[in-house]
Amino acid sequence: MDTEQVTELAAKEPVAAPTNEIASSPERFINRELSWLHFNRRVLEESVNPRHPALERVRFLSISANNLDEFFMVRVAGIRAQVREGIAERSPDGLTPTEQLKLINETVSQLAIDQQAIWRDLRKFLAELGIVLVDGQDVTKAERAWIEDHFLANIFPLLTPLAIDPAHPFPFIPSLGFTVALQLTRTSDGRPMNALIRMPGKIDRFIRFPGAKDGVIRLITLEQATSLFIGRLFPGYTVKGQGAFRIIRDSEIEIEEEAEDLVRLFETALKRRRRGSVIRLEIEAAMPEELRQFVQDALATTDDEVFVVDGVLAMNELSQLTRVDRPDLEFAPYVPRHPERVRDHGGDIFAAIRQKDLIVHHPYESFDVVVQFLQQAARDPDVVAIKQTLYRTSNNSPIVRTLVEAAEAGKSVTALVELKARFDEEANIRWARDLERAGVQVVYGFLQLKTHAKLSMVVRREGGSLTTYVHTGTGNYHPVTARIYTDLSYFTSDPVIGRDVTRVFNYITGYAEPIDIEKMAVSPLTLRKRMIEHIHGETSFARQGKPAVIWMKMNSLVDPDIIDALYEASQAGVSIELIVRGICCLRPGIPGLSDNIRVKSVIGRFLEHGRIYCFGMGQGLPSAKAAVYISSADMMPRNLDRRVEVLCPLQNPTVHQQVLEQIMVANLKDTEQSWQLLPDGSSTRMKAAKGEEPFNLHNYFMTNPSLSGRGKSLKESSPRRLTRRNERPPS
């Protein structure tokens, strides 16, 4: 999109207060919850993007539904708890919890309507492409015979028909549980009865009929298949009415501040979470009103917690459709590259790092290099110690296996396992016990702080002294998500960074606050201060008439202090470009407040997850003298105040150039996957300016090598240099 177009849009956007008043008004912030819903709207819009293959569009629809489930389990649950407890504290944008709930429900209702409309269109489109989802009444005679055999062999044994009467009270329904409610009449005497059938959660939602006549794949949902054979479950009864419902429960964990055994404490809290209060009840529109009221009363839900859905429930499960064998309807497979510099050294990653710092750009470059770093450490007789943080990792994690191998080889191994990683708590308890059994020193960090920093440290004997090798990154030690999340892995043997990381581990394990961090910044101690100092520095350069530029890339921008510092910088004339995938509480493009701030969001094939912060230092951007950092932290109060995070400077010239001039420029240059954020928090798709070629950053990185990992092959083939068109100067 042309800068002039964005400016025009911003000028037309009404603001609720005069410019000279908004700078000190709560209206200078966008509501966090509504901003998140705007983000999820962008995800949903990808399901109608004609550039995406059909099954990828289904995947985006499924992701938007899954996102919404988690939003209710965590954010809405928290706001409802505030309302229940009579808390009227206003959010930074000036809304009470009750006001926020009202706006959330209005926005979600429209979002849900749009999801169903998109699914109806996608279902028709899939049918045209040879993937047909049939309703129960539309199965052929042969299909009915097959599905009956399949039902009796694979579904019937898993179902438990539940009559509801004084002797059989309404059962507990787990969060995200999918249930069919029935109104039945006994054939012998006409006596009415209500009943439930809970759909089993461990089998596929979509059942594929055998064969594919003329290449057409036909499927039926689990609930439709079950409805064909209700008589098998309730013989002697006639169905008078039925409908499915689904609930979402509060999934927040409350923990005591004093606990002798943190693992046992979390195990107890997880059991409580399974029985959290119902915060959302989704009911099929086809369910009779009397039956609907019966379900609502049994679950003790209020009217504003009930959402009547005219369509399919549990849209998060639509992703299962992408398993059908139609690779022509998916993104072409992509195989990540391996850094050539490591190959130049015969696979010796320590030698590659000793040569100079290395940055690996996932998923374009393989996460295997991170696993290799730890595997080589585990098997190297000169390695004496390994320290590792674990926030989220995969099932059957190679990282955990390698730490076990290292401990069994007699090395000193310390693992910080974060028990408070939401929805991964149970897995992390399991990993912690496996590691302890192998002899790993397992610590759990702080009760009040989550350890979100991504750190791995290897201490190796070299030439009579010890050398510390460090890996720090923007993403989790998770080989599965590393294939779809864009993140950065930074490897260095810089002794100063090594000392800083050692101090961070000592802080986590021994609670002693580091007072002499040299290069890095650490939250909750110094990270916010470092960021604000840099923003103020650019503000000062602007006031002196020097070039003043800030580029930032993050998942979320929420922190009021950071936002206010950026507003002040904008008013001083600093040119600020922000790439914020998710929540953004800053209002861009408001005259007199944020004229010089542009915000974009990138939504595409890969999930943008890296955090990069760049400051021109009086030279503008890009510049070899710029301050460039990567971090595990977003600019949110939780990251800056309630988590252990690190901000790491990139000072090696090649690494610095790759992140600033290749990765950041590509993100800013992208037009095919980008949205421009508007002052009201909504967004509009960007388009290439007149005369400018459309640019897709994901395609660029899939087809162009990185700089720092190229080794000697860089002389033979260099990545295509990126340039950006001139933009209007800051006012």
From Swiss-Prot:
The keyword Transferase applies. GO terms for biological process: polyphosphate biosynthetic process. GO terms for cellular component: polyphosphate kinase complex. Its cofactor is Mg(2+). One of its GO terms (molecular function) is ATP binding. Its EC number is 2.7.4.1. The keyword Nucleotide-binding applies. CDD domains: PLDc_PaPPK1_C1_like, PLDc_PaPPK1_C2_like. SUPFAM superfamilies: Phospholipase D/nuclease, PHP14-like, PPK N-terminal domain-like. Residues 713-731 have a biased composition (Basic and acidic residues). NCBIfam families: poly_P_kin, PRK05443.1-1, PRK05443.1-2, PRK05443.1-4, PRK05443.2-2. PANTHER family: POLYPHOSPHATE KINASE. This is Polyphosphate kinase. The gene is ppk.
